[in-house]
Amino acid sequence: MFTLQLQQSVLDSLRNLKNIDTLKKLFWSQLNYERINQTLSRRKLTEAVANELIEEPLLLASGGTNNAFHVIYSRLKSEELSRQGERKIVDHLLKEHPYALFIFSNKSHSRWHFLNVKYDNTLQKRKLFRRITVGEDEQLRTASEIISRLDLEDIPANASPLEIQTRHDQEFDVEAVTQEFFNTYRKYLARWCNYRVNLDISN
């Protein structure tokens, strides 16, 4: 369940995300996904996809009915997080992993992308890629809030992979997150204005 304590714990992990072990802890222990830790065969990768990677993609974790929602980690050859390279890899992996969160790091594990592809029944229409960037120069408060809300304990135990995908799609919706922020800001601003009015009247 989402709590401020969980968000702080996730924030600490994101700030210290320098290796795969921290990523495993994040999903296995903090967000309660099932441990898989299984490499995906390089033989199934196209040459174009394999050329982007320093090693085979890792099926890190899973969730939902039959563990059919997947968390997949890929380490790129480059120090840059190439969006074009990520798209090549994701377009390939989506064919066998339609319900998934994709995570990328650069070669040195100093920068990361958590990548959501909004679900559509037609694979060819899945073109909306949304990313959370994690790195030393990034502001991670919003990232920690979004990722905390992916906690499987906050999703029914018998949820289908589509239901988990839908939760991910909702949490990566920047417009919704922005609207929630402004709604909260407006609420507190209204309270402050009422406080000032009451203060002026009492004076």
Question: What is each of the regions a protein language model found here?
Answer:
Residues 1-203:
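Short, basic/polar, glycine-containing "phosphate-handling" surface segments that engage DNA
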